[in-house]
Design a protein with these regions (language model features):
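N-terminal glycine-/serine-/threonine-rich beta1-alpha1-beta2 phosphate-ribose binding loop
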Residues: 2-100
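Short acidic, glycine/serine/threonine-rich loops at helix termini
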Residues: 24-25, 57-60, 116-119, 141-148, ...
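Active-site catalytic pocket residues across diverse enzymes, especially alpha/beta-hydrolases
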Residues: 27, 31, 123, 150
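Short glycine-rich anion-binding loops that position phosphate/pyrophosphate groups of nucleotides
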Residues: 85-87, 110, 163
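Rossmann-fold NAD(P)-binding glycine/threonine-rich loop
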Residues: 89-100, 109-148
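Conserved anion/nucleotide-ligand pocket segment
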Residues: 148-172
Length: 172
């Protein structure tokens, strides 16, 4: 089924802990701005977590979209944001999301270190994207400029400290 510019982009969130709940807040609070930037409506359509009752502390999360059925959220979204951590279950959900045609955003270093090549190959085969800038370099935005702004340049090396903790210590 072809999508038009008015069909909302369905965002599924896997994990509603500290990072997940704040990610949900940003999506909900900045929905209009995000939609304008993207050129299509965006909608948080599922939040998967182990303890749905815990989301009561986060009034911005619509309780009607909270579930313990992580696989359902992973396979019924256009974009899946994986914030559950670990590797085994995260791998299963990320690969299922990719197989269902969703692009994936993750901050999971362990997942990418252990299963990165498999995940990238699956994404390439399905024609979807994997975004992981938050997983590297303390979320310093250097992957996107390399991929988009410097695409015509031959970058032979990069020097710097790309670890958020180390940057914080050095700044202090």
């Amino acid at each position: 089924m072809a999508r038009n510019d008015e069909t909302p982009i369905r965002v599924g969130l896997l994990g509603a802990g500290t990072v997940g709940s704040q990610t949900a807040r940003l999506i909900v609070e900045q929905k209009d701005e995000l939609s304008a930037r993207i050129g299509r409506p965006i909608e948080l359509t599922g939040v998967a977590c182990r303890h749905p009752k815990a989301t009561e502390a986060f009034p911005w999360i619509d309780k009607a979209i909270v579930t313990t059925d992580t696989m359902s959220v992973a396979t019924n979204s256009d974009i899946v944001i994986e914030l559950i951590g670990g590797t085994t279950a995260a791998r299963e959900f990320v690969l299922a999301a990719i197989e269902s045609g969703a692009s994936v955003v993750t901050a999971n270093k362990a997942l990418l270190a252990k299963y990165g090549p498999e995940i990238y190959a699956a994404a390439e085969a399905k024609g979807v994207d994997i975004y992981f800038e938050a997983a590297v370099g303390g979320a310093i935005p250097f992957l996107r400029p390399l991929r988009e702004s410097l695409v015509g340049d031959r970058v032979t090396s990069m020097l710097g400290i790309v670890n958020g903790t180390t940057n914080y210590i050095l700044d202090e």
